[in-house]
Amino acid sequence: MINYGKQTLKDNDIKAVIKTLKNDFLTSGPKVEEFEKELIKKFGGKFCSAVNNGTSALNIIGKALGWKKNDNIVTTPLSFLATANCIVNNNATPIFSDVENENLT
């Protein structure tokens, strides 16, 4: 079986989450700004906006890329529903590309 969607949590990740949960800020505040600055530094960008989940991020990508009606966007069928939904939400059409049964690539 190929593990699909399994997360890996390290002790320092868990400690960081607990520390943040005990802070006065949960959904915004200094940790979000710190996270955005670290991403800018790591990837060499000019701007970064952290969002609440991957679905929101995918929808923003569609807007940023200017997807519109009659655009065909190729994606994998082996993904969460949000992958195709963000394409439809941006008025484009998802086109599913086949995957290999042996290794799901």
Protein language model annotation of sequence segments:
Residues 63-105:
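PLP-dependent aminotransferase-like
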